[in-house]
Amino acid sequence: MITESREHLASKPLNSESIIRLDTPDDKPSLECESIPSGGHISDVSGGPVSTEVKDVNDVSEFEKCAMEEQTHDEVPISASKITVVVAGLVLAVFCMSLDSTILATAIPKIVSQFHSQNEMGWYVSAYSLTLASFSLAFGKIYTFYPAKIVFLITLSLFEAGSLICGAAPNSLALIIGRAIAGIGGTGMYLGSLLLVAEILPFDKVPIITALLAAMYGIAAVVGPLLGGAFADYATWRWCFYINLPMGGLTFLFVFFFVKTGNDRKRAREANNIVSRFLELDPIGVALLIPTLICLLLALEWGGATYSWHSWRLIVLYVVGGCCALGFVGVQIWRQDTATLPPRLLKNRNIWGTILFTFCLNGSFVVLAYYLPIWFQSIKGVSAIQSGIMNLPLILVMVICSLLCSTLVTKLGYYTPFLYLAPIIASTGAGLLSTMHVNSGSSVWIGFQALFGIGLGCGLSLSIVAAQTALPPQDIPTGTAIVAFTQTLAAAVFNFVAQNVFQNQVLSGLAQAAPGVSAAKLTKAGPTMLREIVPADTLPAVLEVYNTAITRAFYVAVGSAALAIFGAIPLQWLSVKNKKIQAVTAHA
């Protein structure tokens, strides 16, 4: 190895793309991977200072901490054709995972009819969503220490196994167990897709593919109920799960044969034995985190709807969840850098800003994605399938705008301007949607949906890019997991808030406008049955009540979208083009 002279080094600027390494005569590095303060000095092996001004265009100390670590995609090049095949497989995987969240919406009645399981049907959805949310941070820890390719293939196999169990389920219990297994695999599969993209692609190309993966959520939200209804009516509901098998199989083959990542997250391998490796995964923290999240999500789902907020079941959830949460926080403070949720990451303004931004913007999307179809079904009197079609302006515009903005980020390098625009446009679109009334025409709901979709497209997928850009390579899995977890948590929390606003408004509105109509009966029947249950003479008044209740729920989306700006403001202006950390050395 040829090392540069001290005189030359002293005059050479150091930045995040050019990290200089001083070597001792025995070819051992004298400058280890350490944090170098901006404008500071480094010393050579003899102790004499080498006056080298650090000029980091991004002023991000995390990059400097691991200057000696190369990005995976620079270590193991992969051809463009293989990248295309792998990305196609990852898109299929994320689509399957997203589809499983929505496809049962129209198929559940057939399942309940076959298994005679009216009291258990809520678990067909909850078993999947609970495990999907509860294991996301745990997989972030696993991906930190073990190869992304291997972990991804294992979680994909789990998802496929869960889907197979669901499809072949002989009874309701087997279906619920299969859904839980699929949820565990799904969350690891989604996180692995994001990480594999960051590993096999140059980082300035990552935003486009991340946007494509994020678009699968929106597409699945529309396609899922249509497919579920078609399978249930014309084939069998079991195909709602069997459909995952061929698509997942293709993804497995593509990743297995074409991804050869050189980054094996070596820290776990440094441990001397299996016990040490296991302890590196923060098992105590994970064991406390999972019941914390399950208790929280169950409380949000059951509270006020299934059970009273003062029932003993909810009280048990409060106590157990609270105790586990306190224990988890204590373990994270104790373990620090080896924690599932390292405290130092939460002190990084790019991370807590991204968390706030993601939580608020994703929350607004969830509210409108859920309540817009209800508005179409109840106010316009259309079927569930027709309401999905009428929801297309929002989804299509969001996908197109997301891909367009990600392309611009690839060209310009900076994502921050789009994160500023997203809350402004999205809150405006949501605000206009909240002004809709019973007689609003198609030009109104199409235009307002499109405006809201533009706002979502500007920022929804770029939040993951923001976290990955701001972190050094070894922290990217944890940072990505935090954002993915925030997306799931936002869905649960904002659905709960909007549901309470909607239900309270319906109850108070019906008591005044149509006291003879049973709110409980309407809620149980669903929005598509509104015109069959309500007498013709009171229908106009009930429609006004429903319109008011739904648009009040839209207020939640307006407020959450507007609050997202407070997450965008703290973010540094970092360029994805500078996300490349290499040691500058010469080889003889």
Swiss-Prot record:
One GO CC annotation: plasma membrane
Gene expressing this chain: ausY
SUPFAM superfamilies per the UniProt record, alphabetical: MFS general substrate transporter
Additional free-text comment from the UniProt record: In A.calidoustus, the austinoid gene cluster lies on a contiguous DNA region, while clusters from E.nidulans and P.brasilianum are split in their respective genomes. Genetic rearrangements provoked variability among the clusters and E.nidulans produces the least number of austionoid derivatives with the end products austinol and dehydroaustinol, while P.brasilianum can produce until acetoxydehydroaustin, and A.calidoustus produces the highest number of identified derivatives.
InterPro entries: MFS, MFS_dom, MFS_trans_sf
The family this protein is said to belong to: Belongs to the major facilitator superfamily. TCR/Tet family.
Region (Disordered): 1-28
Biased composition (Basic and acidic residues): 1-10
Name of this chain's protein: MFS-type transporter ausY
Pfam families the UniProt entry points to: MFS_1
Subcellular location: Membrane
Function summary: MFS-type transporter; part of the gene cluster A that mediates the biosynthesis of the fungal meroterpenoid acetoxydehydroaustin.
Principal location: membrane
Keywords: Membrane, Transmembrane, Transmembrane helix, Transport
Origin superkingdom: Eukaryota
Membrane topology: Multi-pass membrane protein
Transmembrane segments: 85-105, 120-140, 150-170, 181-201, 208-228, 239-259, 284-304, 314-334, 355-375, 389-409, 418-438, 444-464, 478-498, 554-574
Gene Ontology MF: a single term: transmembrane transporter activity
